[in-house]
Amino acid sequence: MLKATQVNNLDIFTPAKWQTVILRNYGLVKTNLIAKVLKCTTKRVDIEAARLGIEQIRYKMVWREKSYITIIRNNWNLLNYEQLLTLLDMSEEELTYNLDNNDFLGIKLGNFKPEADFVYYQKLSKEEIKQTHKIQKILKKYFIENYVSPFSFEYNKSNGKNYDKHDRIIYPYSLECGDVFLKTSKAISNEELEAYSSNGINGLWIGAKLRDLCYYPFSKKKDKKYLKRRQNLNEFIDFAKSYGLNVFLYLNEPRGINLNELDPKYDHLKGRIEGEIVALCVAHKEIQNYLYKSTKELVKNIPNLDGIITITSSENLTHCKHVPGSDCKVCKDYRPYELACLINNTMFKAIKDAGSKTRIIANQWGWAPYCDYLPGEAKKGIDLLDQNIEIMCVSEFGTHKKGNHFYDIGEYSLSHAEPCIETIELLNYAKQKNHKILGKIQVNNSWEMSIVPYVPCFENVFNHLKKLRELGVNDYMLSWTLGGFPSAALSLASSCNYDDWLNQNFGNDYEAVKDAIHEVSRGFSYFPFNTKLLYLSPLNQGPSNLLYRNVTNRKATMVTFPYDDVSSWVSKDEENDFINKMQNLIKHFKKALKILMAINNPSNDILEIIRYLNVWTICYESTLNQYLFNLNKVDENKNLNIYLNKELKLTLELYKLASLDSTIGFEASNQYVFTQNTFLEKIINIILLKKNV
């Protein structure tokens, strides 16, 4: 588990800390577990929930089954490890696995655990009862009774069938990023699969590890759980194929292993060490043989697997030169691209020798300077790859040119949706070398806005796809773990005429929708793109992020805890530019909303666009508002109520929208960013601050 570290405590907004435990968890966690944490009775938990005014929130087991990350995040700063494990009803081993393996969860939480004292129930004083009664009145006033149930997703079905059979690969919207196939073969519903098929999708990609699907010799623990995963995965592949959907495994190999887990007889294979994880250096013949045998075992035992997408430079420790800074002496004479090609070619040979038709697609993510690739080395890598290995580039990830100005886009983006200079060069080169080529893009959303299933910037998406087609790219991976919703936007990948697509989806209202979407694109062009802003600001939490009167001195964490760390959100020299661009962006978004809301008798599809554009606008407005609040709160003479009043308005608007649609606030790797409880706590937070500023 992550190291427990002493940091400044965060303010709470209930009279007693144990009340915050109830406020954040009532309805998400069984009352007997809350009672066990607080050392009181379940009856007492119910009484105190009623005293707070939240007794109408009903417990739903699905929170623990499908959104345990939400519960972890809600209590990360509130409870110590012992009480957190009790609340989750989770073993230390299971929590450690999730922190280490569930899409960088440990990093997102800050890579450490804030120390916390034990929190136990204590009888309230008369003054605390009085304060609690005031909170009850507030929450009764704003409580929404029919808040939508989590995971009650309704999927769009279109007639956007992909008749040309080019690859349209996506990550399943509802699929968690953990150890899915240990639990079930029915990881995705019939309705979701049917919706993908109807929107032109013919492939699903799923993250996996060879060690979880094949015999793994290097661990002290030898178990056979991989057999169960394999069985479930085979059943799932057959299930998906019944809807015309192929399955691709996304592999980042050979994975490092925890130092404590490594069998000592393999110590000689150790390479680069990062924290508690050690690479098994792929320059060793033993590791190459393992990679060969495991890949061969995989495709022989999962015969209907359509493809493997490899990533050979990434945040995960795989080969010793996956990122700069290796001190391994075994592979010191290798360049990163040589190790990447060694991995890809070894896996391809295993597939070929197995007589399998499983494809290998080499993702070029990280074949770039930030992973220590020198100019020209990505092309050298393509030269080294077997000609039957397919090449995929993250289209927008790299250098862009506007006029005489060059700038970098270092994340998935819909605001800068076009192939970058490096993508154009590499895909053209790979095509000349007779490799099949694919483009990786985002169609639905990105970290610019991840908490709605799609953002309505269809014009940007269509233009991006058009530019890729002009390069000869007709096969696409259409999402990362975010952006997998089966929306009508997916069928853009199989449409060559934007107006026809609009007419098909919006009928007589398509011209008004086109005008509104153009306004969205104009506004989005102002977006002050910066990876720190995407990862560390509240763009993807919006008004659910709590405010604090005093500076917390907490550092923002990746897409999880923005806190009040404004200097990490936006650098000081970019302050005015950020404010001006966000104001312009919001102005255009509101103009787009005005156009859409003027449509008479709008269809459900248009109402959905209005809803998601509203959420998007609210979150951006709140980010700007929180930024100004936190900048100004250090000056005691500043009137902060102007920001608090606006934040309350935005909070109530988002709360209302989220109560109507279970997709709002959900994203596969982070699960639910907010719940009804989150909004109720934020309302108390703002009203108490208003009284004290």
Question: How should these model regions be labeled?
Answer:
Residues 64-65, 101, 106-113, 122, ...:
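Feature activates predominantly on carbohydrate-active enzymes
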Residues 1-163:
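Long, charge-rich, low-complexity intrinsically disordered regions
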Residues 324-334:
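A solvent-exposed, charged loop/short amphipathic helix patch at secondary-structure junctions
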Residues 159-165, 185-189, 300, 333-693:
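Substrate-binding groove of N-acetylhexosamine-processing glycoside hydrolases
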Residues 40, 90, 201, 243-245, ...:
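Short glycine/serine/threonine/alanine-rich loop segments
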Residues 45, 192, 236, 347, ...:
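Aromatic/hydrophobic pocket-lining residues that form π-stacking "cages" and hydrophobic walls in ligand
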